[in-house]
Amino acid sequence: MKSYTKMVAGVVVAACTIFVSACGGGTTSNGEGGSSASGNAANNAALTVTDVQGREVSFDKQPERIILAEGRGVFATSILDKDKPFDKVVARGSDLKTAAPSFYEELEKAVPETKDIPEIGNMAKGDVTVENLLSYNPDVVVMTADHYKASETNGMLTKMDDAGIKYVVTDFRQHPLTNTTKSIELLGKIFDKEDKAEAFNKDWTDTVDRVKETAAKADKKPKTFLWRAAGWNDC
């Protein structure tokens, strides 16, 4: 039973690492908001990234104007820069206040400019317009896999492609064990914070490996249920 208890504890740690790091900077941040050394050297160089959908997106220079289509993307950007999680962000999704009200209140206290970031609506609900996105002159829109699927269905992706709006896809929900590190690596390149992304991914991978090793040694493996998003009816 002790082995099983350790296994469950490890799973919880692995599942929550990204959110804990987002709130406090975790062990991956040195408290400085500067760009990575490698990023500074190539700040004006061309950049090509691959998102979780396997799409390659190229930029003539380092993106400077970024839209977080999901406001909760700040959980991840806080890992890259806990002092300035909205650095380079010109607009964000409207979900942050409603989906994570307690987090939003604390974030607003720690980062006062949070309240000044314009909201674009919710891409998953289809209430975002191309005209609104264009008004912020973005270099790239960061959307989730949920947004990507919804926008593909309702024709928003076609409209964005026609308007020349570049976008990349992240995923921390649908396949977290596969796509968490891919998403952080992607954001590290987009936000020019590759060193912070690499540090977090190492910590994440080490934690997941420990969980797997503990689980493999467990004598009893009863079925468990982890309520990932307490309070949400569709969970």
Name what the model sees in each region.
Residues M1-V11:
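Bacterial N-terminal signal peptides that target proteins for export
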Residues I18-A22:
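C-terminal motif of bacterial Sec signal peptides marking the signal peptidase cleavage site
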Residues G24-C235:
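N-terminal ligand-binding lobe of clamshell/alpha-beta domains
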